[in-house]
Amino acid sequence: MTTTTFPDSAPAPADDARVIALIGFAHGVSHFFHLLLPPLFPWLMAEFGLSFVEIGATMTVFFVVSAVGQAMAGFGVDRFGALRILLAGISCFVLAGLGLAMATSSSALYAVAALAGLGNTVFHPADFTVLNRHVSPPRLGHAFSVHGLSGNLGWAAAPLFLTGLATLVGWRVAAASTIFVAIPAMLLLWHNRALLDTGHHAHAAKQSGHGTFDFMRVGAVWLCFAFFFLITAAFGAIQNFATPILQNLYQLPLGLAATALSTYLLAGAGGILVGGFVAQKQANDRIIAVVLGIAALLALLLAANVVPGWAVLPLMAGIGFFSGIAGPSRDLLVRRAATARFGQAAYGRIYGFVYSGLDAGLAAAPLVFGGYMDRGEYAAVLI
């Protein structure tokens, strides 16, 4: 068993709170722009005559660009500092929103998806570099908890914002209005630049005696990447297909099946909050194994189709809650993998590479599990 513990006291709680809030808000903005396109799919399909496959491919473009770029963005964070890279990423979101508002062809939608994906590349390496450098170790568990929760809130806000405006004033105005989400984040980060700047660490990396790519020889880094890929592919399967799965397995009406998915996501947010307190005590790989094991058992029970329909919502809540608990401990264990041999000089590179597994998993999920859905093997997706 491996455990990470922290000292009981730390200075500057007010500064810690400011850093956590600023990075949390920026992360929420990044998740908001994950969903720049999907809430507008009905309008975009009608405008440009696209099929579900064609419009869905925009998200494949988004996550492929994000996965590849995230691994490279970590090098930029280590070289130029996290603040500059964060501002560059949010600038891409501004351009993506304006580009979508002015789109005149389906090819423009793919360009917008690529630009938004490029903006998304910076957040995990930059966010976690700032948090690890500027938040006191005793509060890192809570910092990672807020970071994860803010992402969920960004996901929740985007459909309400975009569909609401598109219904009232049209999809182009809705797309253009997203700049009023991104620009305040840029201004806040710039205003607090002295608090957030991580400096340049390329020279420190050279002085440490480690080569630029030496981290890729560490087995723990590859294990973290594989773990992120697998767990996010599973999340993507539920996020994309839970509603039709539950409709077919349990004959639930559409509204109730969609409510079950919302229940899963909200319970996941609650789990992240609880997970922050768990991780603050000790970031333990056994805890991660136990809570994910419980979530897997609940998913198997749901897939077995042996429970009554009323039990679907509690089971979905349980899957989301226990999966969420693992998040902050997972992030702290990645921190340990980053610092064990390379200290602070390689935060950006290691976080960028490991967390590119998230986007790779989200990109792969529709392709891998979509085949099961097409064949009517709904339970297999949950298994």
Regions found by a protein language model. Give the residues of each.
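Extracytoplasmic gate region of multi-pass secondary transporters
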Residues: 37-38, 220-265, 269
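Helix-loop-helix hairpin linking two adjacent transmembrane segments in secondary transporters
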Residues: 147-194
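Cytoplasmic membrane-interface "Motif A"-like loop-to-helix N-cap segments
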Residues: 79-90, 280-292
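Cytoplasmic helix-loop-helix junction between adjacent transmembrane helices
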Residues: 112-151
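Helix-to-loop junctions at the C-terminal end of transmembrane segments
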Residues: 69-81, 272-283, 373
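Conserved MFS/SLC helix-loop-helix module at the cytosolic interface between two early adjacent transmembrane helices
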Residues: 68-104
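Juxtamembrane intracellular "pre-TM" segments in multi-pass secondary transporters
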Residues: 3-14, 196-224
